[in-house]
A protein has these predicted regions:
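Acetyl-CoA-dependent GNAT
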Residues: 1-37, 48-49, 54, 109-110
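Short glycine/proline-centered loop/turn elements that form peptide/ligand docking sites
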Residues: 44, 48, 71-74, 91-96
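Conserved GNAT acetyl-CoA-binding A-motif
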Residues: 48, 55-66
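Conserved catalytic-core motifs of GNAT/GCN5-like acyltransferases
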Residues: 64-67, 79, 84-99
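Terminal substrate-recognition subdomain of acyl/acetyltransferases
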Residues: 102-110
Length: 110
């Protein structure tokens, strides 16, 4: 797990987990969380790029992620780093107000 701090204040994290089944051991899945007020500063990009570097060094060949379909800012970031969409999960998330959100699966070869 990578932790991000700015002037000693925690602002986010990024991590990945390998897929454990033997024939899928070349794959890993990642997630990132960054406080909204720190987006657009290159911090998320730097965290993801470092995470991809670490995953490749550990022998992983592809990184996968899920992103909420209406999070266009994150989708643009992932695409700019080389991720491609390969699937859609309808009603993947259910919010407290009872509404649903779709998600996209994205993947990048390392």
């Amino acid at each position: 797990m990578l932790l991000a701090f700015l002037n000693g204040t925690y602002i986010g994290n990024c991590s990945f987990t390998g897929v454990s089944t033997s024939r899928y051991q070349h794959r890993a899945t990642m997630g990132i969380a960054l406080y909204q007020k720190y987006t657009g500063m290159g911090i998320g990009r730097a965290m993801i790029e470092k995470l991809l570097e670490i995953a490749k060094e550990k022998g992983y060949e592809q990184m996968e992620l899920e992103v909420v379909a209406d999070n266009q800012r994150a989708i643009r970031l992932y695409e700019s780093i080389g991720f491609q969409m390969y699937g859609k999960l309808p009603d993947n998330m259910k919010y407290l107000d009872g509404t649903y959100a779709d998600a996209y699966w994205m993947m990048r070869k390392l």
